[in-house]
From Swiss-Prot, chain A:
The lineage of its organism: Bacteria, Bacillati, Bacillota, Clostridia, Thermoanaerobacterales. Heterotetramer of 2 PyrK and 2 PyrD type B subunits. Keywords: 2Fe-2S, Electron transport, FAD, Flavoprotein, Iron, Iron-sulfur, Metal-binding, Pyrimidine biosynthesis, Transport. [2Fe-2S] cluster binds at C210, C215, C218, C234. It comes from Caldanaerobacter subterraneus subsp. tengcongensis (strain DSM 15242 / JCM 11007 / NBRC 100824 / MB4) (Thermoanaerobacter tengcongensis). Belongs to the PyrK family. FAD binds at R49, P50, F51, S52, L64, Y65, Q66, G71, T72. This is Dihydroorotate dehydrogenase B (NAD(+)), electron transfer subunit. Transmembrane segments: none annotated. GO terms for biological process: 'de novo' UMP biosynthetic process. Pfam families: DHODB_Fe-S_bind (PF10418). Residues 2-96 form the FAD-binding FR-type domain. The keyword Transport applies. The keyword Cell membrane does not apply. Its cofactor is [2Fe-2S] cluster; FAD.
Swiss-Prot record, chain B:
The gene is pyrD. The lineage of its organism: Bacteria, Bacillati, Bacillota, Clostridia, Thermoanaerobacterales. Binds 1 FMN per subunit. It is found in: Cytoplasm. NCBIfam families: PRK07259.1, pyrD_sub1_fam. This is Dihydroorotate dehydrogenase B (NAD(+)), catalytic subunit. It comes from Caldanaerobacter subterraneus subsp. tengcongensis (strain DSM 15242 / JCM 11007 / NBRC 100824 / MB4).
Amino acid sequence: MRWKMKARVLSNRRIASEVYEMTFEWKGKKPHPGQFLMIDCQGKTFLKRPFSVNDFEEEKMTILYQVRGEGTKNLSQMKEGDILEITGPHGNGFEILEGKRVLIVGGGVGIAPLLYLAKKVKAQKLYIALGFKRETFLVEKFEGLGEVVVTTEEGSTGRKGLVTSVVEEMIGEVDIVYGCGPKPMLKALQEISMKANVLCQISLEEKMACGIGACLGCACKVREDKGFSYKRVCRDGPVFWAEEVLF
Amino acid sequence: MNLSVEIGKIKLKNPVITASGTFGFGREYSEYIDLNKLGAIVVKGLTVKPREGNPPPRLFETASGILNSIGLQNPGVDAFIERELPFLKSFDVPVIVNIAGETVEEFVYMAEKLDIEGIEGIEINVSCPNVKKGGMAFGVNPDDIFDITRKVRKATSKTVIVKLTPNVTDIKVCAKAAEKGGADAISLINTVAGMAVDIDKRRPVFENVIGGLSGPAIKPIALKMVYEVVTVVSIPVIGMGGIMNYKDALEFLIVGARAIAVGTCNFVNPYCTVEIIDGIKKYMEENEIEDINEIIGSIKI
């Protein structure tokens, strides 16, 4: 039986314009990389909001979020000692294959679930490609976990251009790709990996209501033998094999 | 203390049931609550054949509610009987199956198919478009409600519940048509038709354009309609629409609903059904009420 958790905020800081990192106590179930939490936004929104597990260690959970609306705005104003109401961890996370040459690809705030993954993946070789528009964040936490490449579309930091150009260059040197970010990036990852016959898992996002698989609100189209079907991003995902997703 | 109520042939241990479309087939919520505590479970709507449902996005949050455009995704009646019903039968809770069809014949077909052990009731979703009448919902036409109810009534030995749509001019006429057709009970309301626009794309949020509005935003509408229906029919009424806590539930019971269904609240708080049951018990203790039936219909006007 799963229980509603109350979690005390330990820290909540802005790490880029509109991007925050919040750490809170967590005495619940240990998360698997790629899983998410449903967090009550304190009466500012009707529905809870899904947030990827960014990091977890010794009863401390961290989430990364971008302020997009009333809910996340309210979260951004929470202080140390405030109490969150949370259910989770939810969902089907990354399937970690050991001993592989791994490429982790993140785009913008989509890098959120990838830090915990980078810590947990037991790779023979780990490459990390992080793409941003202009302003970067959290890169320092990935340093030391693997070989990190940073791209910015505007060329403000690291390599100028899309992160997918890095993937195209490196795809021949890896056995599996894990990706999370904007839909166009994920679609490109699908194309690149399928062309190179390399395994690829992507973490998807969709509006959610129940977060546990009952309402069928967060539909995602997936390939089937005879056409397609809709899977639930919250329960069957958020991580899917890239080859099965129909964009 | 007695919380037991009767809806047709179904004896519920308490008046709190789940609303169709918000509880799946019970598997997911069984990880959160003891399903045995529920008065009954109304499972998601079934159709004759499997339905994929509508493309995403299917959800849009509104002030105090949500719009949904799920499109009745379900595995079909046969797969339900084969794969989901055995799971539900492992609990001591009455199972009520919501059925959705495109023609009267489809409703009858499913009612016959579901006349089996383990199922206690059939809830007819008359909010479906009738393809033989240009897509007009069955539930807006009293004659259609009567016709479908009468035929389903003949097709099954189970308790027949007709679920009414609120998107009508006079809900009382619709309720009377269902009763006349032989319904054992009426449940209402289904969702209120609504719409939202994506201001960036300047397109409706849903590919289907229209979605169903539910949540606490619609509770005043639901309560008013339950009140109206209770005054014109003799059969039990199951009230639903925006119930979020035991106080909301009591409002419906006081107005005259024999049971209440919890829907959208399940998304916000997977524990809400058992919390509502506990809240009602506490209210009864505090007010020295021994029998839930003392509360039902006790409104003073």
